[in-house]
Amino acid sequence: MAEKKRYSKRYCKYTEAKIEFIDYKDVEMLKHSLSERYKIMPRRLTGNSKRWQERVEVAIKRARHMALIPYIIDRKKVVENPFKI
């Protein structure tokens, strides 16, 4: 039987930094919760608390709707920075 992966304990960076609001226009801050294909990363990888993970998801979805962040990128078209295409 395959062993489960053990993830290291991560702490919510938003709680530690005492941030009160996540702005959807701050793309640099939102990139920490996105994978290289711009998919939203789960809580177990980012270490966000439930409260902040929900707020990050809403901010990312708003930024996608406003075309500040791309939706999902194809495997063939993965580049380092899609904003400079």
Curated annotation (Swiss-Prot):
Entry keywords, A to Z: Ribonucleoprotein, Ribosomal protein, RNA-binding, rRNA-binding
**Secretion signal: which residues?**
none
InterPro entries, sorted: Ribosomal_bS18, Ribosomal_bS18_CS, Ribosomal_bS18_sf
SUPFAM superfamilies per UniProt: Ribosomal protein S18
Gene Ontology MF: a single term: small ribosomal subunit rRNA binding
Instruction: Provide a GO biological process annotation.
Output: translation
- Name a single GO cellular component: cytosolic small ribosomal subunit
PROSITE patterns found in the cross-reference section:
RIBOSOMAL_S18
Coiled-coil portions: none
UniProt superkingdom? Bacteria
Indicate the family of this protein: Belongs to the bacterial ribosomal protein bS18 family.
Q: How does it assemble?
A: Part of the 30S ribosomal subunit. Forms a tight heterodimer with protein bS6.
What the entry lists under NCBIfam families is as follows:
S18
Q: Give a short account of what the protein does.
A: Binds as a heterodimer with protein bS6 to the central domain of the 16S rRNA, where it helps stabilize the platform of the 30S subunit.
Protein name, UniProt field: Small ribosomal subunit protein bS18
What species was this sequence derived from? Wolinella succinogenes (strain ATCC 29543 / DSM 1740 / CCUG 13145 / JCM 31913 / LMG 7466 / NCTC 11488 / FDC 602W)
Q: From which lineage does this chain's organism come?
A: Bacteria, Pseudomonadati, Campylobacterota, Epsilonproteobacteria, Campylobacterales
